[in-house]
Amino acid sequence: MQQLQNVIESAFERRADITPANVDTVTREAVNQVIGLLDSGALRVAEKIDGQWVTHQWLKKAVLLSFRINDNKVMDGAETRYYDKVPMKFADYDEARFQKEGFRVVPPATVRQGAFIARNTVLMPSYVNIGAYVDEGTMVDTWATVGSCAQIGKNVHLSGGVGIGGVLEPLQANPTIIEDNCFIGARSEVVEGVIVEEGSVISMGVYLGQSTRIYDRETGEIHYGRVPAGSVVVSGNLPSKDGSYSLYCAVIVKKVDAKTRGKVGINELLRTID
């Protein structure tokens, strides 16, 4: 694996000079191998190690290199034709392979090659970009978008129209991460490498970026870039120091544990916020 990483790192340093016409065989094979490993879930752009999320920047570099080494080409779809550098993940799937891998794909859901989809996942008409990782038992609902290299945990529900941001550039940015057993409400946006920790519930229409203040009304603490585990979050506003205006924030209205989540439905958690 170190040899593969070395090839990617070296090629990335000279990426401006690489084209589909002049790319060498070693680089092309290395990039294609990485994309295949991401596609199968054998590698992932970020993983939790000793309780901390670690981003493997060289894998993101491989994804970016894939755009340098491939020409656009025509791709046939059910409703129309496409012209792009990245093939569709399911282009060569037959019924036997779909059954073996054990997930459902509802037309016209789109998944790019290099994204991993785990067993018991349901993809409604949605979009999953290259480098993303969608773990077991997750629902990606209608018109939801999972951005490049985003990491989605087990038993997550991404409701209709949810946007999970991609972060291929800038390269130093960490991917957006939704941990296990989270619920993201309709039309919410989680971007810029924000981490929504395990068991959190995000209400409809909540927008979370690195500069969004995430206010815990019980403690008065303000978080940036991270929703603590077990948080129930709604949209809100915080006043300016002089009280002359207010600005958008997200508000943690309560904390719940796994036992409470098991007994109480998501809708009930969001309705009883007082």
UniProtKB/Swiss-Prot annotation:
Naturally occurring in which organism (per UniProt): Unknown prokaryotic organism
Alphabetical UniProt keywords: Acyltransferase, Amino-acid biosynthesis, Cytoplasm, Diaminopimelate biosynthesis, Lysine biosynthesis, Repeat, Transferase
Keyword Transferase attached: yes
Pathway(s): Amino-acid biosynthesis; L-lysine biosynthesis via DAP pathway; LL-2,6-diaminopimelate from (S)-tetrahydrodipicolinate (succinylase route): step 1/3
Assembly behavior: Homotrimer.
Top-level taxon of origin: Bacteria
GO cellular component: cytoplasm
GO biological process: diaminopimelate biosynthetic process; lysine biosynthetic process via diaminopimelate
EC number: 2.3.1.117
Record: residues binding substrate: 104, 141
Protein name per Swiss-Prot or TrEMBL: 2,3,4,5-tetrahydropyridine-2,6-dicarboxylate N-succinyltransferase
Activity regulation comment: Inhibited by p-(chloromercuri)benzenesulfonic acid and cobalt.
Reaction(s) catalysed by this chain's protein: (S)-2,3,4,5-tetrahydrodipicolinate + succinyl-CoA + H2O = (S)-2-succinylamino-6-oxoheptanedioate + CoA
Keyword hit for Transport: no
